[in-house]
Amino acid sequence: MSKDLLYELIEALTILPGVGKKSAQRMALFLLDKNKDGALHLAQTLEECLDSIQRCEICRQLTSEPVCRICSDESRDAYSLCVVESPSDVLAIESTGGFKGRYFVLMGRLSPIDGVSPDDLGIPDLLRHIQGAKIEEVILATSSTVEGDATASFINDHLESVKVSRISYGIPIGGELEYVDGNTIARAIQGRIII
């Protein structure tokens, strides 16, 4: 018996966040029936990304180069480091133009229940980077959740001789950065508090 490729495509699309069966079905039918060129471009771009995208050797951001464009940019403030949970948080902050320093991407947040430890988040690498790069200020831009707060607190407890602040203004309790508008994020960065 042959595979039902349409069904497989619909199932494959449901792995995307927020995409259920109905949305996946609409997307699949649109790509196959109305926009084959777009579908081919999507498939080629996705394949290229899967082959080429890696983590930056310095900040762990997703990039196609060993060192990302932000870490390579000498015009950025090399002494100010913003610690975020995910690459989407970097994109959200960058879209505001409100931060000119560099980043460290944890790729998650501490969660003992889920078995996510400081080592899983690269926190030992972060602490070595802060020391080695002579960082003067660390901005903790983790989500306003129990896990995000615990992650920020853990990092803060392990930092000495460096100014540490946490974004706060305008980020709702329980909120995640990727869902907050740019102006709110910019104000949160500007209104950060020392902890």
Predicted stretch roles:
Residues 7-11, 25-29, 40, 44, ...:
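Solvent-exposed alpha-helical segments within well-ordered globular domains of core cellular machineries
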Residues 17, 36, 49, 61, ...:
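Conserved phosphate/pyrophosphate-binding and hydrolysis machinery centered on Walker-type P-loop NTPases
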Residues 1-2, 144:
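A short, flexible low-complexity segment enriched in Lys/Arg and Gly/Pro that occurs
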Residues 8, 35, 127-195:
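Long C-terminal interaction/binding lobes of large macromolecular proteins
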Residues 38, 43-46, 57, 69-70, ...:
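Core recognition of P-loop NTPase motor domains used across DNA-transaction enzymes
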Residues 2-7, 11, 15, 27-90:
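Cys/His-rich Zn2+-binding cysteine-cluster or related metal-binding knuckle/ribbon modules and their
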Residues 24, 73-142:
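Extended interfacial segments that mediate partner engagement and assembly in macromolecular machines
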